Structures are given as C-alpha cells and as structure tokens.
Amino acid sequence: MAKRIIYNENARRALEKGIDILCEAVAVTLGPKGRNVVLEKKFGAPQIINDGVTIAKEIELEDHIENTGVALIRQAASKTNDAAGDGTTTATVLAHAMVKAGLRNVAAGANAITLKKGIDKASDFLVSKIKEMAKPIADSNAIAQVGTISAGNDEEVGKMIADAMDKVGKEGVISLEEGKSMETELEVTEGMRFDKGYISPYFATDTERMEAVLDEPYILLTDKKIGLVQDLVPVLEQIARTGKPLLIIAEDIEKEALATLVVNRLRGVLNVAAVKAPGFGDRRKAMLEDMAVLTNGQLITEDAGLKLENAKLEMLGTARRITINKDTTTIVAEGNEAAVGARCEQIKKQMDETDSTYDKEKLQERLAKLAGGVAVVKVGAATETEMKDKKLRLEDAINATKAAVEEGIVPGGGTTLAHLAPALEQWAASSLSGEELIGANIVAAALTAPLMRIAENAGANGAVVAENVKARAGAEGFNAASGEYVDMLAAGIVDPAKVTRSGLQNAASIAGMVLTTECIVADLPEKKEAAPAGGGMGGGDFDY
C-alpha cells in the first residue's frame, strides 16, 4: 500500500492536532463537576460514560496522521490504567500540556533530545517527591474516601468498597456483577483468585475488555499436560449436551488440543476456556486440590487412578461465575462452606507441623486464598446504560483503593502536582542547565494542568485557582465541589499516590516520544471507487 511521509514541523503539528482532539473529549470528564460523554455504538444502545480510558479507546479519526497522535496519548491512558487502574484522564491532560509546551520550544529551535532528557530527569525527581509525600492508609474511613472520589463523588460506592475490604481483607478479591435490582448490593461468598490468565486470547467472551466470563460453568481440574484432544472428547461431549460452559485448569495444553478447543469455542459448539494451573510441582497439586474442594469437584490425577478419558460429569467442579483476563482468574463459588472450612483446618495443621519458614509462608498464602473468599458487588441501576456507567465507576474505585493500600494516599484534586511545581522549578534551577532546564520547566508548567481543568469544569477560572493553590502550604487545595479552598486530607479529597505517580510517568514518557518525532510514515487514504450506475439508468448527470 502507498505511504505518505511527513517531516519536521508538519509531522509534529499533525500529531498535536490529534492529541488536542482526544484530550478535549477526555478532559470534560475530569473532577467532581466533570460531564459525561456519549459513545455511539454500531450495535445496541449508546453508552454514557465518565471514564477517560474507555473514551480514548473509542476515538478513531479519519486522518491517519492525526490518528497516530490519538494512539500515542491513548497509550499513556491505557498504560496508567494497566498499572494503577485509574487516573487515566489526569495522564491524558498532563501529556497534552507537556506536548503543547514542548512543541513550542522545538519550533523555536530547542533540541528535542536534550528537552526529553530534562523531562525524564524532572519526572524521576517528582516520582521520588510523591513517594515522600504519600501517607499510608490508616483505616476503612480513608479507603471509603478514596473510593468515593474515584467513583465520581459517590459516597455510597466508597462505603461499600470499604465494607468489602473489611470483610475480605486488603489483599482480598472484590468482584463486580450486574445485579437484578435497582440497589447496589454487597455479598461475601467463597471463592479465590490466582495469577494465571487464559492460555489463548480467543477464549475471551468480551472482546472489548478482553475478558472471559463464564456463568454457572463446569470446571475440569487435572495436574497433567493435555496433549491429545481425544483424551478430552468423552467429557466434552457430556458437557456439550448440558449446554453449560467449561473451564479447564491443567498443567498445560499442547497446541493441537488447544487449537481444537479454540475452533469449537469460535464456532459456538462449546463455550470453553483454558487456564494453566498456578504454582509448580507439589505446590501446584496442592493448589489444584484446594480448587477442587472449593468447587466441589475432583482433581483428575493419575496418583488417584483417575484418567481424563474416563472423566464423568460428577467429577467436575462447579462455580457461580468465573472471570478470566490475560493475567488472573477469579472463581466465585458457593454452598461449600463445610468442605472449605475443613480444608482450611487441614492447612493450619500443616503450618503448625512444618519448621520451614518458606513452607509456612506458602501455606499461609494458600490459606488466605481459600479462606478470604470473594466480595461480590452486585451493581444495581434503572437502565442498562446507567448500569454500564456505574460498573466502570465501581471498577475505577476498586482499583484506586487497591492502589492506595499499596503506596498510600496524597492530597487529591490536582493539588499534589500543583504544589510540586515550585519545588521542581527550584531543584531544576540548581541541578540542570541549558535545554535540560527548559525540559524540566515544561513539566513544571504542565503540573497545574489537571487542577486548572478540574476548576474550569466546575465553572471557576483555572489559571487563578492554580496560582492560589501554588501559594498555599501543606495539603491545602481547591474543592471543586464546593468552590472553596480547604485542607484536602481533612476534607477527604485524596488520590492514591500510585495513580498520581503512574499518570505522571506515562505522560512524561509519551511527551518525550512526541517531541523527538522528526518524520511520520502513514498509509495514504484509500480512494473509494464510485458505485456503478443503477441498472437501466445510465451514468447521466442527473440524480434520479
């Protein structure tokens, strides 16, 4: 296919145009008074959402070069989402501000490579400062505050996530389900999560989120490698007759067997997914036995004289729901309390008997996975559109609270970044010189961008608010919901340090890449052939 090649300033300006379009669409959602965005869908009802990364993923522009700019900033948002699960809008606004200021300097003759070095050094300095400022989470009240802010100031959501964390522990699993009523409810049930995702992405049932969700599935547990699909055929035929989905958890699945499963899944013959068993050696077997107890099934192992080809339906485990993504598998089971309790007692006995610290640690891990259970939040809403929006907000809130537990909290509402701007300017003036100093100052100027946007979305003057906040000490910032200047920590307006840090690092990384671009190679738009004239109507000049 023919390519179009654009150089120098033209290339950077085209990228900038795409970045402007994406940033404007995403930035309207920022802050407590941020608005929603409606996404038109080819099939089904339109979606109304308030989540930066979801909006960014939907934007595709006609111009290939501008679309490249969109894709670059989208990457900053999705990387922040992968790392921290929230803060995607902040990352987008920061990257946009850095790119705008940086391009002005490059156009004025600054060396892009040296600017990038300055940006990277400034980013490293700020990351260390954010870590210093972070305060560890003290109680469930702080968890509720983080959840509330992340869910768009929804206190009910914040409180529910704090309750869920109380019940399943800070390391526990919180899963989301679509509820049947108008109310959002919390339920704690047996279940576990382990760090293995699907073997093939073709098993995903939701291609937008790249997740496989199986409702009321059968679970086949085996500690052997599945090499031939013939071994599976008898059990697959039995399951196909029931019409229920199947999850296979095995040591591994060879290519031939995997290909057969994928083909059956794509043709709709059988809704199946496969996951590698977690752990190694004896520990893997023990974890598979834990899963068998949890799901009321049997581990098919040759040690017990069981073979795959002789497996019956009653040997398989069952669960209420299983969610699998590329990295993790979450099993939500129910109705097995007695068996799970007995298994937990057995693990505790083993812990008492062993002298090895390593073994004790691993047994403790297994116990926590099995006994902790899963908190299921059933999302309630009046309409499907509201349900989808609420689900995205809840997901952000859960991710934000987990990030806060990991790395602590900092004052929210763009306050932390705005307060760091003067500190960065001082450090850069004493430690850097020339164009590196200009690069660091580009970052310093961009740090107030999220705060300004939050203020503007609330109807205030962004530049005035930013100057006022920079002049204040400690954790004082602008509460956009009330329009007052308050102590953000005392008012419960907090952000997870991990979210702020990830957003900043990804924005600086993308900005550096855009500034150092000197040439773009993109596909030429395809010329569409004119449609042939209608039968018997000739190709005249008239519109019939």
From Swiss-Prot:
Its EC number is 5.6.1.7. It catalyses: ATP + H2O + a folded polypeptide = ADP + phosphate + an unfolded polypeptide. GO terms for cellular component: cytoplasm. PROSITE patterns: CHAPERONINS_CPN60 (PS00296). The keyword Isomerase applies. GO terms for molecular function: ATP binding; ATP-dependent protein folding chaperone; isomerase activity; unfolded protein binding. Belongs to the chaperonin (HSP60) family. PANTHER family: 60 KDA HEAT SHOCK PROTEIN, MITOCHONDRIAL. This is Chaperonin GroEL 2.
